[in-house]
């Protein structure tokens, strides 16, 4: 399969298109044919490994995972033996900020992590680009004791996290 690969940190110039081995799902994973993947702020930070502290989890001198990408949408093409939440043919989207390897034709993903069935009215491009902001916004909102009718100021509501926060807060009644 084809994938975007990097073996050192840096600018987008370090990215290369290469043939790599197609992954196989373990018993609790699914294999997804990637139809759309975005480039978001997490991907840019991972590519450069900045701030430097990121290198303690991503690889001190070079990336541990050679295929970048954190966000995707696609089709389930194979499921591990222990997976009962997804089936072949499901349209799914997901996000993992620890480098998911979504810049490839196929990826494996744990069935019990940040993955869901796509809403019917979403296309692959919409689903593949909407998750990162919502992931962080939901995480922040979930940490506060939000009450229905409470007024909330979202500082920076024009980016992906802020716009997702506004929508989620409205959904939760703030």
Language model regions located:
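A structural motif shared across PLP-dependent enzymes of the aminotransferase-like
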Residues: 98-111
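Nucleotide donor/acceptor-binding cores
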Residues: 1, 90, 147-151
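Glycine-rich beta-strand-centered segment in the early N-terminal region that forms part
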Residues: 21-38, 52-99
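Mid-domain Rossmann-like dinucleotide-binding core that forms the NAD(H)/NADP(H) cofactor-binding site
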Residues: 128-174
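Short N-terminal binding/cap micro-motifs at the start of the first secondary-structure element
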Residues: 10-17, 41-42
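Terminal peptide-recognition signature
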Residues: 3, 34, 76, 107, ...
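Short Gly/aromatic-enriched secondary-structure transition segments
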Residues: 44-54
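Extended, non-globular alpha-helical segments
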Residues: 35-39, 113-144
């Amino acid at each position: 399969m084809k994938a975007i690969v990097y073996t050192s940190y840096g600018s987008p110039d370090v990215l290369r298109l290469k043939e790599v081995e197609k992954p196989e799902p373990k018993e609790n994973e699914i294999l997804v044919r990637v139809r759309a993947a975005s480039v978001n702020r997490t991907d840019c930070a991972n590519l450069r490994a900045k701030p430097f502290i990121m290198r303690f989890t991503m690889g001190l001198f070079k990336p541990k995972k050679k295929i970048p990408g954190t966000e995707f949408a696609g089709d389930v093409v194979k499921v591990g033996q222990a997976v009962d939440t997804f089936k072949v043919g499901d349209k799914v989207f997901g996000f993992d900020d620890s480098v998911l390897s979504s810049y490839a034709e196929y990826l494996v993903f744990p069935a019990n992590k940040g993955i869901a069935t796509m809403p019917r009215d979403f296309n692959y491009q919409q689903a593949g680009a909407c998750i990162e902001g919502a992931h962080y916004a939901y995480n922040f909102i979930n940490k506060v004791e939000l009450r229905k009718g409470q007024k909330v100021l979202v500082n920076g509501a024009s980016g992906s996290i802020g716009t997702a926060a506004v929508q989620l807060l409205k959904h939760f009644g703030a």
